[in-house]
């Protein structure tokens, strides 16, 4: 891995100590890990260092941080952005994908799951789990409930295979199992998932 900076915008110290140790295993030297607790400082650090990987904790100031993600993608579109959030916050995760993130980590994830998610993202893939797949499919139906209303959604232009992958993931299959079932290479399944992310970003 190239020695390029990465940045963490963090709220949960214990979780981010774990993330830092995983990033070291993935090749990021500690001297190139930049830490920030607020968006004002993070914006300054972003301009100074142009990190290629940015971890953003969505525990606090969620709407402001979603807006910050959009700002990052405008000025640094090649940055890999990973959000950190609770597993049950699927609508927040969907909003983050709309803003342009490449992946996510849950507080509930094990060390191995965090390692695999970050590794998948850095090699060009995108993680997905059953609840997110179900959410995308329900969004695709045209209506989605928010806390205050039900609105008509702009449909996601999914291909037949992208729809099939989402259905299989919503049924509990992993990308690895889907690749075996479809007798295709895993990277092709990961490519379809990445394309789904990109289509959500364009909504």
Predicted regions and their residues:
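Helix-turn-helix/winged-helix DNA-binding modules
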Residues: 76, 157, 170-171, 200-201
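Conserved beta-strand elements of the Class I
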Residues: 5-7, 166, 170
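N-terminal regulatory/sensing modules of transcriptional regulators
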Residues: 1-145
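A cross-family signal for key residues in well-ordered alpha-helices
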Residues: 70, 98, 167, 180, ...
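Hydrophobic residue at a beta-alpha junction
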Residues: 60-64, 168, 173
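Conserved catalytic core of two-component sensor histidine kinases
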Residues: 108, 115, 159, 166, ...
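Regulatory hinge/linker segments at domain boundaries
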Residues: 138-167
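Recognition helix of helix-turn-helix DNA-binding domains
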Residues: 172-203
């Amino acid at each position: 891995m190239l020695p390029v900076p990465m940045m963490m915008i963090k709220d949960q110290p214990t979780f981010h100590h774990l993330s830092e140790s995983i990033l070291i295993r993935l090749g990021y030297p500690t001297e190139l890990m930049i830490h920030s607790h607020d968006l004002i400082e993070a914006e300054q650090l972003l301009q100074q260092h142009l990190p290629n990987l940015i971890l953003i904790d969505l525990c606090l100031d969620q709407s402001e941080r979603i807006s910050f993600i959009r700002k990052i993608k405008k000025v640094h579109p090649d940055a890999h952005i990973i959000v950190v959030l609770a597993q049950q916050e699927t609508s927040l995760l969907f909003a983050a994908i709309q803003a342009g993130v490449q992946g996510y980590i849950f507080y509930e994830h094990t060390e191995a799951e965090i390692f695999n998610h970050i590794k998948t993202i850095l090699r060009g893939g995108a993680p997905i789990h059953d609840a997110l797949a179900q959410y995308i499919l329900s969004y695709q139906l045209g209506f989605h409930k928010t806390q205050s209303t039900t609105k008509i959604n702009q449909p996601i232009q999914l291909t037949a295979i992208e729809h099939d992958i989402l259905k299989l993931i919503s049924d509990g299959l992993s990308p690895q199992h889907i690749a075996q079932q479809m007798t295709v290479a895993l990277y092709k399944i990961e490519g379809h998932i990445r394309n789904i992310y990109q289509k959500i970003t364009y909504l």
